[in-house]
């Protein structure tokens, strides 16, 4: 599961992301915790567990949601009208962001080449998400 890093998670919170996430960070960013009710897909206990499955005190809203890359890309598309196109070329993965705020979403008004070339799709997606958060919304 590819969750966003702590810095991106903080920026997403500041920009209004509020999707249901399977994991959260402590405010210090020191530990990623998983929500058992979401992670297992069934109501087990309404409590958070660390990576070693030891119960942690539930501290509620002070935790910072850690969405997956897929969740963030969907949020950018559906809520912000920004489509992220990640493609592979001979040198690695690159990204272009399209603005799609049209009723039919079949055309775009603007596009931005993100200055990133990475070895993996995930690295490129995270760099692109960070670019969008810092420059476009």
Regions found by a protein language model. Name each.
Residues 1-34:
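Extreme N-terminal leader/activation tails
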Residues 1, 108, 129-137:
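Short intrinsically disordered terminal tails
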Residues 18, 37-118, 134:
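N-terminal segment of the canonical double-stranded RNA-binding domain
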Residues 120-132:
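A short, charged, amphipathic alpha-helix used as a generic interaction element across diverse proteins
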Residues 5, 69, 122-125:
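Short amphipathic alpha-helical segments that mediate assembly, nucleic-acid/protein binding
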